[in-house]
Amino acid sequence: MRGDEVGGPIRWRMHIPVPPEELFAILNSDEGRASFWAESAIEVDSHIEFRFINGYTYRGKVLARRPPNLLSIDYLGGSVRFELHADGRGGTDLLLTHEGVTAQEWNEVHAGWLNVLFPLKAWAAHRVDLRNHDPERAWDEGYADQ
């Protein structure tokens, strides 16, 4: 987002044309997260096991959950907040904030969130999965549609 600096918090805003309750349900469910974020993202006892197409796994922890406005998780060594605000017209203004990203990884993580947010919007608004689901065409190989 404009004003973000390498090593500081990563922030992205996105408008998604569904109500906060619907968007929160996607972010907060195993099936929802698997529809746009990871091949699977199963929550057990407030821990989410993310499994990605390239074989990478990450075990995050839910830090805060206040339906339908806030979901915060430990993710990739930092904390990620999804703040959802009704736009007054049936949609949601989402603010994603990722804190704790090292300066060394900042540019890749900053860009990588777009690879999560655009598929989230496509799934929420149109039930379309933008990902290719091909392990030979993953983020590590330069593909944005992993």
Residue locations for each model-derived region?
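Well-ordered beta-strand positions in beta-sheet-rich domains
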Residues: 11-13, 57-59, 79-81, 110
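Short, highly charged C-terminal tails/helix-capping segments
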Residues: 122-146
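Short, intrinsically disordered, mixed-charge
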Residues: 25-32, 67, 111-126
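Residue-level preference for beta-strand/loop junctions
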Residues: 6-8, 54, 76, 90
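Glycine-rich portal/gate segments that line the openings of hydrophobic small-molecule binding cavities
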Residues: 28-79
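Beta-strand/loop substructures that line and gate deep hydrophobic ligand-binding cavities in soluble
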Residues: 70-122
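Generic structural detector for well-ordered beta-strands
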Residues: 13-17, 49-51, 61, 83-85
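Hydrophobic ligand-binding cavity/cleft-lining segments
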Residues: 1-40, 146
